[in-house]
């Protein structure tokens, strides 16, 4: 189940908010410029569906989202035990970074935590299948799919060159294990 835990950024033991209510999650993230939604698709593609099948399943949602955001492309990413260089990839995601465009993800299968560092707070959002999250450009954050990930997600891009991170150099992600 999706949930949000908010901490003060100087104390990982000081929980400011913890909720699994999607409306409360959306409101809390909206307050920092992020977006969170639940998409209820009548059909969920199988875990081993081809990227095209996954994209086609969610095409109506993607068309609307891409029209709203001006995004130019979408693709499917799978992160699991068979992912080449999984450890190095996880290390990249776990380092606090920003992007020059919004980072938009929709979880088709599995789960992962997007952790946003904004205005003295750490917002740990556990996203599960059916969740859409959009992290605003320039927002320091990191991502953790866990030690044994099994995630399928849609990625939506404005810049067709794909995922490019600008690392902050802050080690805060090491101090805040995901909830």
Curated annotation (Swiss-Prot):
**Gene3D superfamilies, alphabetized:** Jelly Rolls (2.60.120.10)
**Which residue numbers mark the site May play a role in metal incorporation in vivo?**
96
* Keywords (A to Z) from UniProt: Amino-acid biosynthesis, Dioxygenase, Iron, Metal-binding, Methionine biosynthesis, Nickel, Oxidoreductase
Q: Does the keyword Metal-binding apply?
A: yes
Cofactor remark: Binds 1 Fe(2+) cation per monomer. Binds 1 nickel ion per monomer.
What does the subunit comment say? Monomer.
Q: Please report the name of this protein according to its UniProt entry.
A: Acireductone dioxygenase
Q: Which organism is it from?
A: Gluconacetobacter diazotrophicus (strain ATCC 49037 / DSM 5601 / CCUG 37298 / CIP 103539 / LMG 7603 / PAl5)
